[in-house]
Amino acid sequence: MSIPSLAEALATADTLFDRPTVEAQFVRMGKEIDQALDGERPVFLTVMHGALVFAAQLALAISTDLEFDYVHATRYRGGTTGHELHWLREPAVPLEGRIVLLVDDILDEGHTLKAVRDACLRMGAKRVLVAVMCTKLHGRRAEGIQADFNGVDVPDRYVFGYGMDLNEQARNLPAIYALAD
Protein backbone atom coordinates (compact mmCIF):
# COMPACT_ATOMS: atom_id res chain seq x y z
CA MET A 1 0.00 0.00 0.00
CA SER A 2 1.45 3.37 -0.97
CA ILE A 3 0.91 6.14 1.53
CA PRO A 4 -0.72 9.26 0.08
CA SER A 5 0.26 12.76 1.16
CA LEU A 6 -1.78 14.16 4.02
CA ALA A 7 -3.64 16.52 1.69
CA GLU A 8 -4.49 13.67 -0.69
CA ALA A 9 -5.58 11.45 2.18
CA LEU A 10 -7.85 14.06 3.74
CA ALA A 11 -9.44 14.87 0.38
CA THR A 12 -10.69 11.30 -0.01
CA ALA A 13 -10.77 9.93 3.57
CA ASP A 14 -13.94 9.02 5.38
CA THR A 15 -14.54 10.66 8.75
CA LEU A 16 -15.40 7.73 11.00
CA PHE A 17 -15.80 9.57 14.31
CA ASP A 18 -15.83 13.32 14.94
CA ARG A 19 -14.38 14.94 18.04
CA PRO A 20 -17.59 15.05 20.14
CA THR A 21 -18.24 11.37 19.46
CA VAL A 22 -14.71 10.38 20.47
CA GLU A 23 -14.71 12.59 23.56
CA ALA A 24 -18.01 11.09 24.75
CA GLN A 25 -16.26 7.72 24.88
CA PHE A 26 -13.65 9.06 27.32
CA VAL A 27 -16.35 9.86 29.86
CA ARG A 28 -17.88 6.38 29.55
CA MET A 29 -14.48 4.68 29.71
CA GLY A 30 -13.39 6.75 32.70
CA LYS A 31 -16.39 5.57 34.70
CA GLU A 32 -15.79 1.94 33.69
CA ILE A 33 -12.11 2.18 34.64
CA ASP A 34 -12.89 3.79 38.02
CA GLN A 35 -15.28 0.94 38.76
CA ALA A 36 -12.72 -1.72 37.76
CA LEU A 37 -9.96 -0.11 39.85
CA ASP A 38 -12.18 0.09 42.93
CA GLY A 39 -10.02 2.86 44.43
CA GLU A 40 -6.64 1.21 43.83
CA ARG A 41 -4.02 3.56 42.34
CA PRO A 42 -2.67 2.07 39.09
CA VAL A 43 0.35 2.78 36.96
CA PHE A 44 -1.18 4.57 33.95
CA LEU A 45 1.19 3.31 31.25
CA THR A 46 0.90 5.08 27.90
CA VAL A 47 2.21 3.47 24.71
CA MET A 48 3.96 6.26 22.80
CA HIS A 49 3.46 8.05 20.40
CA GLY A 50 0.05 7.03 19.16
CA ALA A 51 -1.69 6.93 22.53
CA LEU A 52 -0.46 10.34 23.71
CA VAL A 53 -3.56 12.33 22.70
CA PHE A 54 -5.98 9.63 23.86
CA ALA A 55 -4.14 8.99 27.13
CA ALA A 56 -4.12 12.64 28.16
CA GLN A 57 -7.85 12.99 27.65
CA LEU A 58 -8.70 9.61 29.14
CA ALA A 59 -6.69 10.39 32.28
CA LEU A 60 -8.82 13.49 32.86
CA ALA A 61 -11.97 11.33 32.76
CA ILE A 62 -10.70 8.97 35.47
CA SER A 63 -11.39 9.98 39.08
CA THR A 64 -8.99 7.48 40.66
CA ASP A 65 -5.51 8.86 41.34
CA LEU A 66 -3.00 7.67 38.72
CA GLU A 67 0.77 7.23 38.64
CA PHE A 68 1.98 8.09 35.14
CA ASP A 69 4.65 6.38 33.06
CA TYR A 70 5.12 5.48 29.42
CA VAL A 71 6.68 2.91 27.15
CA HIS A 72 7.77 3.23 23.57
CA ALA A 73 7.48 0.10 21.49
CA THR A 74 6.59 -0.02 17.82
CA ARG A 75 6.15 -2.35 14.89
CA TYR A 76 5.21 0.21 12.25
CA ARG A 77 8.24 2.54 12.03
CA GLY A 78 6.58 4.97 9.60
CA GLY A 79 4.79 2.39 7.46
CA THR A 80 1.28 0.99 7.33
CA THR A 81 2.12 -2.61 8.21
CA GLY A 82 3.99 -3.97 11.20
CA HIS A 83 7.03 -6.17 11.44
CA GLU A 84 9.42 -6.97 14.30
CA LEU A 85 8.81 -5.27 17.66
CA HIS A 86 11.29 -2.50 18.55
CA TRP A 87 11.62 -1.43 22.20
CA LEU A 88 12.67 2.19 22.62
CA ARG A 89 11.73 2.61 26.32
CA GLU A 90 10.50 0.22 29.00
CA PRO A 91 8.58 1.37 32.12
CA ALA A 92 10.60 3.37 34.65
CA VAL A 93 8.09 2.98 37.50
CA PRO A 94 8.39 -0.32 39.40
CA LEU A 95 5.42 -2.51 38.47
CA GLU A 96 5.88 -5.19 41.14
CA GLY A 97 2.53 -5.88 42.82
CA ARG A 98 0.76 -3.04 40.99
CA ILE A 99 -2.23 -2.78 38.71
CA VAL A 100 -1.14 -1.42 35.34
CA LEU A 101 -3.58 0.41 33.09
CA LEU A 102 -1.97 -0.02 29.67
CA VAL A 103 -3.23 2.70 27.31
CA ASP A 104 -2.84 2.56 23.53
CA ASP A 105 -4.44 4.19 20.52
CA ILE A 106 -5.62 1.11 18.63
CA LEU A 107 -5.94 -2.62 19.04
CA ASP A 108 -5.26 -3.90 15.54
CA GLU A 109 -3.56 -7.29 15.32
CA GLY A 110 -2.42 -6.81 18.91
CA HIS A 111 1.19 -7.97 18.69
CA THR A 112 2.59 -4.75 20.19
CA LEU A 113 0.03 -4.57 22.99
CA LYS A 114 0.45 -8.24 23.81
CA ALA A 115 4.24 -7.89 24.01
CA VAL A 116 3.99 -4.83 26.25
CA ARG A 117 1.32 -6.43 28.45
CA ASP A 118 3.37 -9.61 28.81
CA ALA A 119 6.47 -7.56 29.68
CA CYS A 120 4.51 -5.78 32.42
CA LEU A 121 3.46 -9.13 33.87
CA ARG A 122 7.08 -10.36 33.75
CA MET A 123 8.04 -7.19 35.66
CA GLY A 124 5.69 -8.27 38.43
CA ALA A 125 2.45 -6.40 37.71
CA LYS A 126 -0.34 -8.17 39.56
CA ARG A 127 -2.85 -7.22 36.87
CA VAL A 128 -2.73 -5.43 33.51
CA LEU A 129 -5.86 -3.76 32.18
CA VAL A 130 -5.83 -2.64 28.54
CA ALA A 131 -7.60 0.55 27.41
CA VAL A 132 -7.66 1.50 23.73
CA MET A 133 -9.27 4.35 21.85
CA CYS A 134 -10.35 1.99 19.07
CA THR A 135 -10.42 -1.66 18.12
CA LYS A 136 -10.08 -2.67 14.49
CA LEU A 137 -12.68 -5.22 13.42
CA HIS A 138 -11.08 -8.19 11.66
CA GLY A 139 -10.09 -11.79 12.27
CA ARG A 140 -6.29 -11.36 12.47
CA ARG A 141 -5.95 -10.61 16.19
CA ALA A 142 -3.05 -12.21 18.03
CA GLU A 143 -4.22 -14.94 20.34
CA GLY A 144 -4.71 -13.91 23.95
CA ILE A 145 -5.08 -10.14 23.63
CA GLN A 146 -8.19 -8.02 23.94
CA ALA A 147 -9.13 -4.62 25.29
CA ASP A 148 -10.69 -4.39 28.72
CA PHE A 149 -11.89 -0.90 27.80
CA ASN A 150 -12.58 0.19 24.22
CA GLY A 151 -13.67 3.57 22.88
CA VAL A 152 -14.96 2.78 19.40
CA ASP A 153 -14.76 0.00 16.82
CA VAL A 154 -13.24 0.85 13.43
CA PRO A 155 -13.41 -1.03 10.14
CA ASP A 156 -10.49 -3.00 8.73
CA ARG A 157 -8.99 0.03 6.97
CA TYR A 158 -6.01 2.27 7.63
CA VAL A 159 -7.17 4.80 10.25
CA PHE A 160 -5.50 8.01 11.36
CA GLY A 161 -6.06 11.13 13.44
CA TYR A 162 -6.63 11.58 17.17
CA GLY A 163 -3.10 10.37 17.90
CA MET A 164 -2.84 7.76 15.13
CA ASP A 165 -0.47 8.70 12.36
CA LEU A 166 -0.41 8.71 8.60
CA ASN A 167 3.30 8.43 7.78
CA GLU A 168 4.15 10.24 11.05
CA GLN A 169 1.65 13.03 10.26
CA ALA A 170 -1.94 13.82 11.26
CA ARG A 171 -1.68 12.72 14.90
CA ASN A 172 -3.20 16.03 16.02
CA LEU A 173 -6.31 15.82 13.84
CA PRO A 174 -9.39 16.04 16.09
CA ALA A 175 -11.29 13.15 14.45
CA ILE A 176 -10.72 9.55 13.39
CA TYR A 177 -10.42 9.10 9.63
CA ALA A 178 -10.07 6.07 7.35
CA LEU A 179 -8.13 6.08 4.10
CA ALA A 180 -10.29 5.59 1.04
CA ASP A 181 -10.43 1.97 -0.12
Regions found by a protein language model. Give the residues of each.
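PRPP-associated nucleotide enzymes
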Residues: 1-181
